[in-house]
């Protein structure tokens, strides 16, 4: 037994049901906290979230978290579902729809480290009279890996500052977002800022500076630096 297959009750126009699978080491490990859930916030799971039961596999790509769960199978092979075998896989930027071979790549399971800026928003206008700017956001990494550092920049990545992390800094079984914030002095004379963020997880994985080297035809695994452009208003 190498895989645990999960099949949902929903189906597409061909009649094929949605399915996915997890490696047995993920599905059955007590350190991965995989569950079959029937309640959400103390009440039965809502229909749109998978009533009556669904799989919850924290740290794993959402495509494996099967809703409306109807069948579980222990198997030597992964799910035969289209969405396991022929979707949600990453490829080189050189691969296009004419050359792609989905059998050549493994199905996405744990996701890469990522982060985002929530405040300020793209296009925001801040006053130079404030003399400082406060940034807020979140960071997260797949597989339960904790976030050990978040770096932020006000000049497009030329110089960096370490953000403050909120709450307990768990290095393993870290399933939730790690919130971060930073209050920084405004660069003198600047009339615009390009704010960037990148995170580092507990195995020292970090993020690429642009999408170019990780672009893929399916648009998955996109974890380049998040950038936000803001204006500085001077009286």
Feature roles, as predicted:
Residues 1-235:
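Extended, aromatic/histidine-rich regions of cofactor-dependent oxidoreductases associated
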